[in-house]
Design a protein with these regions (language model features):
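Acidic-basic catalytic patches of nuclease active cores, encompassing PD-(D/E)XK
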Residues: 9-39
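Polybasic (Lys/Arg-rich)
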Residues: 117-184
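Nucleic-acid nuclease catalytic cores
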Residues: 39-41, 62, 67-68, 77-83, ...
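Active-site metal-binding core of divalent-cation-utilizing nuclease and nuclease-like domains
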Residues: 31-58
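Short, small-residue-biased leader/transition segments that mark boundaries at the very start
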Residues: 3-8
């Protein structure tokens, strides 16, 4: 039904906004890879690829894709992000990792990480140590050697209620917690 689809779209939008508010930097346009067509010596810009959220912790950059997927409820691998999303994250990561301007901005020791953030209910899932964030695995491709961190997209579940309770933009403790989990 289209009513159910509209509700889902609204919830997906709210999920993306909550993730961006808690973890993301405000001005992320710099991090959007751009493309263009050249036709008859005239450049025609395409719309940018736009990652949901860019998180910074120390000198590292984390490209976060908020996925309002039901894996956190079902545990079914069919409910995880597909190849198009995985490949897009790798593209974002490669762009940030290889563009000189980002090394200038974040330093030579900058590392780039990728993660999908999906909702779950920590009370229903009986998490060890009552964790509000849980790493469930990582997605990789067969067209990269997966030697770079950004080529391995981490699958992270985030407790919906605890995320909703955070009213601070760029909450530093949550950012550090998520950064550690992604890197682990």
């Amino acid at each position: 039904s289209s009513a159910a689809s509209d509700v889902y779209k609204r919830q997906e939008y709210v999920w993306e906004k909550m993730i961006d508010k808690v973890f993301g930097i405000e001005n992320k346009a710099d991090y959007f890879p751009k493309t263009s067509w050249w036709i008859d010596k005239t450049k025609h810009e395409n719309a940018s690829l736009e990652p949901d959220t860019i998180m910074i912790s120390g000198t590292n950059v984390y490209i976060l894709d908020a996925k309002y997927y039901k894996y956190g409820v079902t545990g079914n691998t069919r409910d995880l992000p597909e190849s198009t999303s995985i490949n897009k994250q790798i593209t974002y990561g490669e762009y940030v990792a290889t563009e000189k301007k980002f090394k200038k901005k974040h330093g030579d020791n900058m590392r780039v990480y990728n993660a999908f953030l999906m909702p779950f209910d920590s009370l229903k899932r009986k998490c060890p140590d009552n964790s509000q964030m849980l790493k469930i695995g990582e997605a990789i491709s067969n067209w990269k050697d997966n030697s770079e961190e950004y080529q391995k997209i981490q699958g992270i579940l985030i407790d919906v209620k605890s995320l909703m309770s955070i009213n601070v933009r760029q909450e530093i403790n949550e950012i550090e917690k998520l950064a550690k989990l992604i890197e682990s």
